[in-house]
Amino acid sequence: MDEDYYSAVRAQSPKTYLYALTAETHLGEVASVIITTLLASGRLNIKQISVKTKLAIKSIKSAIVSLIQLNCLYYWQDDKNPTIFYYSVNETGLKTLVYSGDILNHITQEYGDEEAEIIQNIIMNGHLKLDDYLRQYDNDLEKSDEASLRLEKEKIFLKLYNEGWIKILSLNDFHHINDIWEKLFDDTLRNTPRSSTTSEVKRLAEAQSVCKEKLMALLEKTKQPLDLYITENGYKKLNPNLVLTFNLTRFQKRSRTVALTNLAKSRIGLITSKVYEAALKSVENGSPDLSHPFLEIPGLINNPTDVKDFKDSLETTLTAEKKIVFTVKDVMRYFPKLLDIKNSVITENSKRSFNDINANPETSNKKIKLENGNAFNTGGGASGANTSNSNNHLTASSFFTDEDRMSIIEQHLRLLAAGTNTQFVHEISPGRYAIPFVKLSNELKQFHYESLVKSTLQDQAFRVLRCIKHLKLADEKSIANAVLLKEKTVRNEVYQLIKANVVEIQEIPRSVDRAASKTFYLVKYKEYHRFESLINCLVYNMAEIVRNIQNFKMENKILLDKCNRVDVEGNEDEMLLDSELKTLHGLQNREVMNLVRFNRTRSLWDIFTL
């Protein structure tokens, strides 16, 4: 594609820019044009797409089939004309392609190569029928080997499903949640009769409440069908007729676990963060999703305060259902066995004994004369004390039981609950803890946002920002008095913050005619808008990195095509010139460096989309 096309896509929106490049990389130029057009126009049918893109209907149909199969498009049948289907963008499939490398890397490290192979096949095909996948192990093997290999694969599928990494694909997954909601709402409203004693506002509210219950029941029914499991020869396994797809929400929960663990590591320490990671893993599968169907329906929940209250209510429900509640024994199951945690928490008794020994070194070697005339060292003598401490240490090391380990882990949990200003866990009852995901997600965003401001705009801008957040609405003079800086310095730092879209100006008129001479300006900070602005910047940077990789690959297309030839692949040292080898190594290094930048930027994107 020419540069004019990318300039137009770049100007449309950062998300369109990234998704267009992702679709082009995996599915080709036609798919990229379709994604760009649908993001710009909302939803269209095939004829409308052809008119806007000037593409042939045949090529559009073939690209749409691939996009739907990879969960990159929704479709919806027209109620008035059943032969017409409308298509819109499904971000789930595009995000899965963006995360695909990290997904496979995590599955390989956490489970193994066989599990990663299954996940890779599911991502490549979008979804697959379980029986079709297992049928490949029924061909050229002996009966016993064939049965055992198929049984092992069935166990892997069952494990991945129970852990939440794969889910059942239903017909509703191909429809946008807003289309399902509107259909349910229209049917519910039609069946809700009008009454002279009931206002129209109350009637709409009642219909909306009933529709919410119907929607949640419908989604829950598709998650847990009646024919989910079958029992064969005493083994419980998944029904081979099920169609499975990858569950992106599960990987997003894992990314949240990593981010919260790193936050605990920076605030408290390494060993405590390992304890916290084990606690997060114990409730990871049952933890709240990063998004909810009600939040994806336009107009249902709009106000950021209402969104926060809704997420708090979901978290309260999960806590009441014990889905995000854990104990020390739950942490023990996920805690690394080889990690030595002895003496990792300093108690008051250990502090006191250490201070008593080292408080006065002169008196520790003082000698007194006994009745029999012999001298006695009041410090106990070096040899006697060391021998006693050595014996105690050997005894403690030899009998460090699971109860001792659980006791130390519980001390770390109490440190997470009340050791810092950030409360990482709540002790809801003696020995039972819950994790406040909503509050911690906000803390995580604030921590990284302030770190970015401090690293890019330096310390003085960071101080000014903290002051503005504390004062909520402030002028330059009040900021200067609070942060102990000159007004000129504050003015420069505020300008840099405004330029970086960190804070915004609010005009305060002093007269009715809003005369400029009688107007003064205050500075304020709005958290929600700042995070949204930063997300757009991160997405744009990710797209620019992908575009950069494509550019230098196109510049060296002849060399790369030569390296991909069958006779050259694997024999590059013999078939390529020295200059070509040098260029090839340079391209590989550039690609690795750009991928590292992409992953770092994407990790920040993960944090601010929690």
Curated annotation (Swiss-Prot):
Gene Ontology BP, a term: transcription initiation at RNA polymerase III promoter
One Gene Ontology cellular component: RNA polymerase III complex
Keywords, in A-Z order: DNA-directed RNA polymerase, Nucleus, Transcription, Zinc
Predominant subcellular localization, coarse grouping: nucleus
Family (UniProt): Belongs to the RNA polymerase beta chain family.
InterPro entries for this protein: POLR3C_WHD, RNA_pol_III_RPC82-rel_HTH, RNA_pol_III_Rpc82_C, RPC3, WH-like_DNA-bd_sf
Record note on quaternary structure: Component of the RNA polymerase III (Pol III) complex consisting of 17 subunits.
Subcellular location field: Nucleus
Role of this protein: DNA-dependent RNA polymerase catalyzes the transcription of DNA into RNA using the four ribonucleoside triphosphates as substrates. Specific core component of RNA polymerase III which synthesizes small RNAs, such as 5S rRNA and tRNAs.
Span list, region Leucine-zipper: 538-559
Protein's name in the database: DNA-directed RNA polymerase III subunit RPC3
Pfam families linked: HTH_9, POLR3C_WHD, RNA_pol_Rpc82, RPC3_helical
Matching Gene3D superfamilies: Winged helix-like DNA-binding domain superfamily/Winged helix DNA-binding domain (1.10.10.10)
Gene source species: Lodderomyces elongisporus (strain ATCC 11503 / CBS 2605 / JCM 1781 / NBRC 1676 / NRRL YB-4239)
Domain of life: Eukaryota
GO molecular function: DNA-directed RNA polymerase activity; single-stranded DNA binding
